[in-house]
Amino acid sequence: MLHTIGILIWIIIKILVIVVPLLLSVAYLTYAERKVIGYIQVRIGPNRVGLKGLLQPFADLLKLITKEIIVPTRSNKYLFVIAPLFALVPSLVGWAVIPFQEGVVLANINAGVLYLFAMSSLGVYGVLIAGWASNSKYAMFGALRSTAQTVSYEIAMGFALVGVLLAAGSMNLTDIVNSQKGGMLHWWFIPLLPLFLVFWIAGIAETNRAPFDLAEGESEIVAGFHVEYSGIGFALFFLSEYASMILISTFMAILFMGGWLSPFEGITFLDQIFFVVPGFVWLLLKISFFLFVYLWVRATFPRYRYDQLMRLGWKVLIPVTIVWLVVTSLMVVAHVKPWF
């Protein structure tokens, strides 16, 4: 009995070690977004609360927590309240299979890629439930847009994943990282460049980020699926969006950029200098790079029209992935490096 309780406590501690830093990362990602976009637009960004505005995320959280939760009169109250949790939970439980470095993973399962792909796709159910339960036409339009967008881009994302599985020969995330050993030139983003770009574009669309933020297009459908949410409900949707961004960036770093591996492997003098850097630091740097690109894209590109969004998904991304999957399959069968 005591042994079982001890195991349970240890599992809870490991979960908290992942979730607490993740929630803090989400808080400061919002701060980084406002700062980065501010500098791109030749503004300063938040600079009043704390040193250089570093306490701004906590001020925003306090504001949202103290706001009144308003439930629309004819809405489905139970689904309305629970929908933000449906959106948030998948972006948190996906971290169970993320390897931070060799052996440092909560659950080292053989179907890690499949599990993570499923978790990254489940968030759309929260969006759909929120749109329907709100009893608002704007919320419903936003939810339908988001659902159609996710279904469209999941296909391209799934095909891009298959390319990595063919090249690495495993669905275990640790094995996929180990298959990229040998330095930056051995990372999968080089031989699978078209699939890498498609996966990245589909990842932006999956998380409803600009320029694919049709689900919450302010100029067309007010705030989209969360137009009726205020206070903590809105905060949970906000949290789920940024947590999903971090999860997709981590997925990208593991699949295509060598995960925790150093980019200087194979370059003797640089490898000796950076040998002391822990693997998880390299992973965090790669995640930070992808998150910066997220913010850069948001500040640079205008929002797509809905028909353009669908056309890009079905007529461009899916054909590209199918063609490159055929190429990858032929290279693997022919034992051509670095595909094999």
Curated annotation (Swiss-Prot):
Recorded family membership: Belongs to the complex I subunit 1 family.
Signal peptide (residue range): none
GO molecular function: NADH dehydrogenase activity; oxidoreductase activity, acting on NAD(P)H, quinone or similar compound as acceptor; quinone binding
Chain ranges passing through the membrane: 4-24, 78-98, 113-133, 151-171, 184-204, 244-264, 273-293, 316-336
PROSITE patterns recorded: COMPLEX1_ND1_2 (PS00668)
Compartments it resides in: Cell inner membrane
Key words of the record: Cell inner membrane, Cell membrane, Membrane, NAD, Quinone, Translocase, Transmembrane, Transmembrane helix, Ubiquinone
Enzyme superclass (EC): translocase
The protein's assembly and partners: NDH-1 is composed of 14 different subunits. Subunits NuoA, H, J, K, L, M, N constitute the membrane sector of the complex.
Role this protein plays: NDH-1 shuttles electrons from NADH, via FMN and iron-sulfur (Fe-S) centers, to quinones in the respiratory chain. The immediate electron acceptor for the enzyme in this species is believed to be ubiquinone. Couples the redox reaction to proton translocation (for every two electrons transferred, four hydrogen ions are translocated across the cytoplasmic membrane), and thus conserves the redox energy in a proton gradient. This subunit may bind ubiquinone.
Catalytic activity: a quinone + NADH + 5 H(+)(in) = a quinol + NAD(+) + 4 H(+)(out)
Protein name (database record): NADH-quinone oxidoreductase subunit H
Gene for this chain: nuoH
GO BP term, example: aerobic respiration
The enzyme's E.C. designation: 7.1.1.-
InterPro entries (alphabetical): NADH_UbQ_OxRdtase_su1/FPO (IPR001694), NADH_UbQ_OxRdtase_su1_CS (IPR018086)
Superkingdom of this protein's organism: Bacteria
Record lineage: Bacteria, Pseudomonadati, Pseudomonadota, Gammaproteobacteria, Legionellales
Protein topology in the membrane: Multi-pass membrane protein
One cellular component term from this protein's GO annotations in UniProt: plasma membrane
